[in-house]
Amino acid sequence: VGESGSGKSTLAKSILGMTEYKGEIIHHSRRPQMVFQDPYSSLNPAFTIRRIVEEPLRIFGKYPPDEIRRRAEEMLTEVGLGPEFHDRKPGQLSGGQRQRVSIATALIVRPRLVILDEAVSALDVTIQDQILDLLMKLRREFDLSYLFISHDLNVIYQCCDRVIVMQKGEIVEENTVDEIFDHPVHP
């Protein structure tokens, strides 16, 4: 967490290797994946959602086409989008459904770390809760770690075990979620 401009998104980009940084990033996982705030801008409007979810496997994996299709369909079902959605395009989906496609696309390559940059802030509260519940279920099922970037302290409290507070590009506080909320050093 941190105010706008504190370096939260820059930290995420550094972990993903999208920006230069000084220092060292250590993680013992397959390539981290990202889920963005606005799923519509990160989904190709010309592709079906099945094709969108298949793309990372086409790029990163060496799988036969039938396995790519099967895995994409399984992942879409896992995030709550059954076969009736697979041939739809992003413009035919609600915001929550598009965010489910983004989550499926991130998880299809089986990362250990998923970075969620304000991933539920554009959704109404009811849909936010559904997506957060889905993320917690997937976290347990796939043994995932999440890096949540959010201004919404309720999201942080509900979903995180540990919290870092950033200010002017620096980590100024790091502790358990309970310690940060009960005894903040940087309120």
Q: What are these regions, as identified by a protein language model?
A:
Residues 156-158:
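A short, surface-exposed alpha-helical micro-motif characterized by mixed small hydrophobic
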Residues 89-93, 97:
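Conserved ABC ATPase signature
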Residues 103, 114-115, 131:
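Hydrophobic anchor residue at the start of the ABC signature
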Residues 108-112:
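A short, proline-enriched helix->beta-strand linker immediately N-terminal to the Walker B motif
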Residues 67-84:
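Conserved ABC ATPase "signature" region
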Residues 174-175, 183:
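ABC ATPase "signature
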